[in-house]
């Protein structure tokens, strides 16, 4: 599933080609995504100029002069730029055609993504209760410490809770916990403030590094420019269960937390 770095990579790839451009038409070949694409999307968006492309958590917000297209890539979706008129392959469900001669093409084999329209996106029900962005000053170790008090749940699903902080998905939670030396099974409420300060720093570092390297391509993610991400080459623990820890050589262990697979080093993480 595309996580925050992959979505931010997509935003950075498509924004220069969209911002300031006018939409000539919207071609929808399949409306049945996680939520149906609005029947009147073409009417609402065509003729409008795209003002700004933003990201909120794992949602892309394509802001027009009036209204905003909210897009989510789901489990395996992607957005990329193609030339208008390029024949669509299977699973290529939407083209937003621009007067420049380019089109933003949405591909989603599993159809778990979304394309919705809103006049007030930040108050949309999907975005309204989201926590702070992890790479801003609104997120820090003190927030983690305060929100974790009294919680018996494991720390990994705690930091993956979008009400606590957005965009810390399975890959990056696993890597940040390793970097901070924290066992992902440890109760969130039993971790000290000092360790949370360290964890917040590592969450920011890991996410920033992944964005810089274009995200993590583990299966089928490609960025808005059609290129894969390269952060998978720097993964220390994610997907490496049973292999030797790159730091100490101990065999990495697999565990399931919050219905998600996780990997950790029993020696480096306490």
Swiss-Prot record:
Binds 1 zinc ion per subunit. GO terms for molecular function: 8-oxo-7,8-dihydroguanine DNA N-glycosylase activity; class I DNA-(apurinic or apyrimidinic site) endonuclease activity; damaged DNA binding; zinc ion binding. CDD domains: EcFpg-like_N. The active site is at residues 2-3, 58, 260. Transmembrane segments: none annotated. PROSITE patterns: FPG_CAT (PS51068), ZF_FPG_1 (PS01242), ZF_FPG_2 (PS51066). Monomer. Belongs to the FPG family. Involved in base excision repair of DNA damaged by oxidation or by mutagenic agents. Acts as a DNA glycosylase that recognizes and removes damaged bases. Has a preference for oxidized purines, such as 7,8-dihydro-8-oxoguanine (8-oxoG). Has AP (apurinic/apyrimidinic) lyase activity and introduces nicks in the DNA strand. Cleaves the DNA backbone by beta-delta elimination to generate a single-strand break at the site of the removed base with both 3'- and 5'-phosphates. This is Formamidopyrimidine-DNA glycosylase. It comes from Pseudomonas fluorescens (strain SBW25).
């Amino acid at each position: 599933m595309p996580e925050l770095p992959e979505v931010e990579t997509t935003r950075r790839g498509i924004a220069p080609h969209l911002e300031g451009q006018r939409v000539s038409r919207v071609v929808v070949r399949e409306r049945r995504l996680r939520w149906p694409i609005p029947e009147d999307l073409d009417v609402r968006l065509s003729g409008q100029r795209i003002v700004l492309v933003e990201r909120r958590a794992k949602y892309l917000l394509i802001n027009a002069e009036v209204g905003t297209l909210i897009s989510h890539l789901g489990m395996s979706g992607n957005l990329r730029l193609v030339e208008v008129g390029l024949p669509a392959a299977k699973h290529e469900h939407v083209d937003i055609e621009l007067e420049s001669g380019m089109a933003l093409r949405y591909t989603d084999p599993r159809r778990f993504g979304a394309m919705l329209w809103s006049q007030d996106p930040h108050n949309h029900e999907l975005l309204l209760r989201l926590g702070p962005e992890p790479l801003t000053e609104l997120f820090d170790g003190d927030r983690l410490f305060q929100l974790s008090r009294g919680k018996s749940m494991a720390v990994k699903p705690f930091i993956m809770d979008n009400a606590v902080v957005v965009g810390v998905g399975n890959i990056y939670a696993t890597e940040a916990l390793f970097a901070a030396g924290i066992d992902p099974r440890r109760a969130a409420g039993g971790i000290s403030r000092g360790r949370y300060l360290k964890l917040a720093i590592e969450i920011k570092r890991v996410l920033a590094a992944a964005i810089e390297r274009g995200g993590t391509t583990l299966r089928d993610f490609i960025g808005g420019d059609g290129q894969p991400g390269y952060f998978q080459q720097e993964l220390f623990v994610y997907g490496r269960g049973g292999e030797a820890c790159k730091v100490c050589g101990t065999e990495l262990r697999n565990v399931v937390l919050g219905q998600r697979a996780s990997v950790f080093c029993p020696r480096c993480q306490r």
